């Protein structure tokens, strides 16, 4: 089953945050000491336009390189800029599959979807 994760809008995605942002602290939890210099951010799955907004926002905070690290395990693609995910029961769509099987399936999905318009995928980092 496929799910649309977000709309392709020129805004920051929901839950966008950086380690420099202010947030509530709980005195019973460890401190955030050192995190404000770590220069990391996170968000929900961005659309293609939202990814551009993230890059623009982060560019105001650093002159160095910006790396996208994709930690999602389920297969996900951009279709006309809209992020979509393939998932199964309990979000276990890829459970039990080899890495190569998943990569081959993702390539097949992208090729099939690409016949109907532009599609893009995030490349999994290892």
Task: Map each language-model feature to its residues.
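Cys-dependent protein tyrosine phosphatase-like superfamily
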Residues: 1-126
């Amino acid at each position: 089953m496929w799910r649309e994760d977000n709309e392709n809008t020129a805004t920051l995605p929901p839950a966008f945050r950086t380690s420099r942002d202010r947030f509530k602290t709980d005195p019973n939890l460890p401190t955030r000491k050192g995190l404000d210099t770590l220069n990391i951010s996170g968000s929900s799955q961005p659309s293609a336009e939202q990814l551009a907004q993230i890059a623009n926002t982060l560019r105001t905070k650093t002159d160095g390189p910006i790396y996208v690290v994709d930690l999602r395990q389920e297969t996900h693609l951009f279709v006309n800029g809209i992020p979509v995910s393939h998932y199964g029961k309990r979000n276990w769509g890829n459970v039990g599959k080899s890495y190569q099987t998943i990569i081959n399936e993702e390539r097949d999905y992208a090729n099939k979807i690409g016949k109907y318009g532009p599609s893009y995928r995030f490349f999994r980092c290892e």
